[in-house]
């Protein structure tokens, strides 16, 4: 079944009634929008996506800023789990598995056989071809590889960091 839509703060609108019933945004620095969405639904209100609504929000201007944003999202997922245990799904673990898988491929390539690098090379090839097909630009295709790895690594590392900090070493 499809998950319920959780609006994000950059495009979220709600009534004064919802604001009063939920108490508004929590003090979370990251993940505050998902926390608010969960509390809205827990208070008995419905959420929906309005595909015709036009929303503009500022994109990150560098890969460094993008990494930081996505890293914080990975950490926020564990903080959300602590507040709302039912909100953590299997899909949230995938970037962490990607990080571990990449490290195992690299270590295998260094210490065993270059064949261990084949899964990474295949993934890079798939990212490149898919982006090139969609965007018709070799430059964008190469940047897509970088962006995809940054997104997956940043979220995965943030998630792993939060698991250790909040759950294992607490």
Task: Name each model-derived stretch.
Residues 1-3:
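Short, P/G- and charge-enriched loop/turn segments at secondary-structure junctions
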Residues 8-23:
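Conserved nucleotide-sugar donor-binding
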């Amino acid at each position: 079944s499809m998950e319920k839509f959780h609006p994000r703060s950059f495009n979220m609108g709600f009534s004064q009634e919802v604001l009063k019933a939920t108490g508004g945004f929590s003090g979370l620095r990251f993940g505050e929008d998902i926390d608010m969405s969960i509390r809205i639904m827990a208070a008995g209100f419905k959420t929906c996506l309005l595909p015709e609504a036009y929303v503009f929000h500022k994109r990150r201007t560098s890969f460094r800023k993008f990494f930081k944003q996505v890293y914080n999202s990975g950490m926020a997922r564990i903080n959300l789990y602590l507040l709302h245990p039912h909100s953590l799904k299997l899909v949230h673990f995938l970037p962490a598995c990607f990080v571990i898988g990449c490290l195992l491929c690299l270590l295998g390539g260094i210490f065993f056989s270059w064949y261990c690098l084949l899964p990474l090379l295949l993934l890079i090839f798939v990212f490149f071809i898919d982006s090139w097909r969609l965007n018709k630009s070799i430059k964008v295709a190469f940047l897509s590889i970088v962006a995809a790895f940054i997104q997956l690594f940043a979220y995965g590392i943030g998630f792993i960091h939060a698991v250790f900090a909040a759950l294992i070493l607490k």
